[in-house]
Amino acid sequence: MRARTLALWLALALPTIGAESGTEPKFRLAPSPDLNEPGKKKASDEVQQIATRALAAMTKGDLEKAKKDFLKVLEQVPDNVPTMINLGLLEYRKKNFGEAERRLESAVRLAPDSGLGWLIMGVVQYDQNKFDHALASLAQAAVLEPKNATVHHYFGVTLGQKGWYSGAEDEMRKALELDPNYAEAHFNLSVFYLQRNPPAVELARRHYQRALELGAAPDPDVARSLTPPQP
């Protein structure tokens, strides 16, 4: 890419209040509203109400109140995996990456088949530049959630950070097969096409334009790379 590697758009969209339709990225990761787990005793109505209150606080951005209520849930239902995952996501939003990873590690240790737990842990590890760990977590998420476009997107971005662009392209295409309107995946696939030697400019342009149509912000580096050189 003309001796320059473009920044990848790894967008983690979380619930916001008052967002107008079409002005926010499609929500990709959100807290789990259900405490119940297969093969375990059903959570009481009282505990579920506390969890619902925590989710409402988290959606409003009151992370401290949400955390207090999530911890109350764990007092009543120790080792509840959905709550551990929610706490991991909450700590991620607070940028407490170490604590987020600790919560998520506990969750996937108790429920190794939790695709959501592996996905969020992979994103947390990615944001700490722990790309090898992120690859392992996201690969596990992809095995557990093969029909999840978000998993393939984040897995592809992480492969791209390692310089494995062919695999990254494959994962972006899988994401788009599952969700053709995934703006971030279109954007990142355009970036990966520009990493080819020679760059696949027309393919990149097609996906970049589609990303813009779907609400992605214009990127001057990508736009310059798609502009034919002046004679």
What is the predicted function of each stretch?
Residues 43-79, 89, 93:
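Alpha-helical segment of the N-proximal tetratricopeptide repeat
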Residues 23-38, 191-231:
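Terminal, low-structured helical/coil segments at or just beyond the last alpha-helical repeat
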Residues 59-69, 93-106, 127-140, 162-174, ...:
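Structural signature of tandem alpha-helical TPR/SEL1-like repeats
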Residues 47, 81-82, 115-116, 149-150, ...:
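Helix-start (N-cap) detector for alpha-helical repeat units in TPR-like alpha-solenoids
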Residues 86, 120, 154, 188, ...:
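Canonical tetratricopeptide repeat
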Residues 76, 110, 144, 178, ...:
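Structural marker of alpha-solenoid helical repeat scaffolds
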